[in-house]
């Protein structure tokens, strides 16, 4: 600084805010030409004046600063001053260039960019949040009609996050560009007085961008956190509690309650159920395992559900067996799958000889206001009873008074002996009896 000041004063060159003594044609005597003193008072006074003039530059008006800058640019010693500054910078610039190296891209910023691209938040609008939601839904096993509303909410919220992100990113880029343009214009203006190369301007722009990158990283990090929270609330939560379709649940429940004494389907049955429900065999196995656990923990809660499926089964059997006549019909042959149909619109009952079975369930209201209490089957015929399915060692669903559809649940107390079921059809005052062949589900020995 002292050397530059002496050179400028020796050559009559001034700087903005520093007046040139003696006019443009006169040179100020160099301090070295003055008589030396023991304490160096003239040199200290000269440096103090220069510093004082520099401090007063900020107090100058714009017109005064422009006038002094114009006077400096028009001074005849300006080229000499500029060449001296270039020589000084050439000596000191080597160490500066060697110390500055290109900094690598921040890996954290790269991870944030990759995540925003994968979620459809960053990048061009090619489906955006809708494409990301569709991809996530496909990965989670598809979208059922029950979850379509939730997926719509997810897409809407992801679209809002994308809009906010791009709006804030646009503000950030605008502020960064404005500041960079201002600095570049300032450096170009200063390059008329002091040597500034284009590479130095580029280096300064890179420094500005690195300073602004902290703001950009904060914006991207907060956006990624918002996307992760949204995923945890919608897609990830749904993936953990994926539900089967209503039709698949109906098929599985019907099989479970029709095999309640032994709800362990074979591999063939699992494959058939999986095909009907459009799911995998492992999903069928998991469903039955969970269903058995829930049923054992709370039998009373699932009792009503069992009654509902019993009514559905009984109604389907009785409706399928209607022939339009009052005479009884013979059930299907041995390939009927373990059940036989009871036809006719009249009230019917089934009495089994040689065994008893206990009944449990709630008493219901029969036709005519007569109470129906838990009862035991006996060889004697009882009217107003209808049987839907009969299998050994399984729970027997009996529909009491078909016109009322009151369901009762019976359980075998001992293995069934060899017996012949008798169908009693109550018609008026008389009984008409017919012997039926044993269904394949009943023991033959």
From Swiss-Prot:
GO molecular function terms attached to this record: chromatin binding; DNA binding; DNA-binding transcription factor activity, RNA polymerase II-specific
UniProt subcellular location: Nucleus
InterPro entries associated with the record: HD, Homeobox_CS, Homeodomain-like_sf, KN_HD, PBX_PBC_dom, TALE_homeobox
Polar residues bias spans: 319-332
GO biological process: animal organ morphogenesis; brain development; embryonic organ development; eye development; neuron development; positive regulation of transcription by RNA polymerase II
Composition bias type Basic and acidic residues, residue spans: 31-44
Region annotated PBC-A, chain positions: 49-128
Single GO cellular component term: transcription regulator complex
Region (PBC-B): 131-236
Span list, region Disordered: 13-44, 319-338
Family per record: Belongs to the TALE/PBX homeobox family.
Chain's role: Transcriptional activator that binds the sequence 5'-ATCAATCAA-3'.
Protein known as: Pre-B-cell leukemia transcription factor 2
Organism: Xenopus laevis (African clawed frog)
